[in-house]
Amino acid sequence: MKGTSMGVAILAMIVMAQLMVHPSVAITCNDVTGNLTPCLPYLRSGGKPTPACCAGAKKLLGATRTQADRRTACKCAKTAAPQLKVRPDMASSLPGKCGISTSIPINPNVNCNTIP
């Protein structure tokens, strides 16, 4: 009986731990560039984005749930784009090519601090 009570207590603790809300982890520039690395051939030269590129772009969009995350992602992308020789026209067309709907403007002149 003592073993059964201990087992139930442990099981209850495991269930409670799984039900706890885990704090969200803020997005980093490594997350942004890592998710978009498969897109570099498209972002530099055009053509058609690969399935891996679109999957990374969708993953990045899913990771930017908060205003702070969206602004961080914007700032990271703006910093990295010139260094990686990303064409602005290709960057702005990527969401549409991947079937992604976003209200975030994608252009080199966007003020990241105004993104909702």
Swiss-Prot record:
Transmembrane segments: none annotated. Disulfide bonds join 29-76, 39-53, 54-98, 74-112. InterPro entries: Bifun_inhib/LTP/seed_sf, Bifunc_inhib/LTP/seed_store, Plant_nsLTP. One of its GO terms (biological process) is defense response to fungus. It holds the Pfam family Tryp_alpha_amyl. In germinating seeds, detected in the entire surface of the cotyledons, shoot meristem, inter-cotyledon space, primary xylem and immature vascular elements (at protein level). Expressed in seeds, but not the aerial parts of the plant. It comes from the Eukaryota. Residues 1-26 form the signal peptide. Coiled coil: none annotated. Keywords: Antimicrobial, Disulfide bond, Fungicide, Lipid-binding, Membrane, Plant defense, Secreted, Signal, Transport. Induction: By salt stress, abscisic acid (ABA) and fungal infection. It is found in: Secreted, Extracellular space; Membrane. GO terms for molecular function: lipid binding. Its main location: secreted. The keyword Hydrolase does not apply. One of its GO terms (cellular component) is extracellular region. PANTHER family: NON-SPECIFIC LIPID-TRANSFER PROTEIN 2-RELATED. Plant non-specific lipid-transfer proteins transfer phospholipids as well as galactolipids across membranes. May play a role in wax or cutin deposition in the cell walls of expanding epidermal cells and certain secretory tissues. Permeabilizes the membrane of fungal spores, inhibits germination of the spores of the fungus F.solani at a concentration of 40 ug/ml. Inhibits the growth of F.solani with an IC(50) of 6.5 ug/ml, weakly inhibits the growth of the fungus A.alternata. Binds oleoyl-CoA. Belongs to the plant LTP family. This is Non-specific lipid-transfer protein AP10. It comes from Helianthus annuus (Common sunflower).
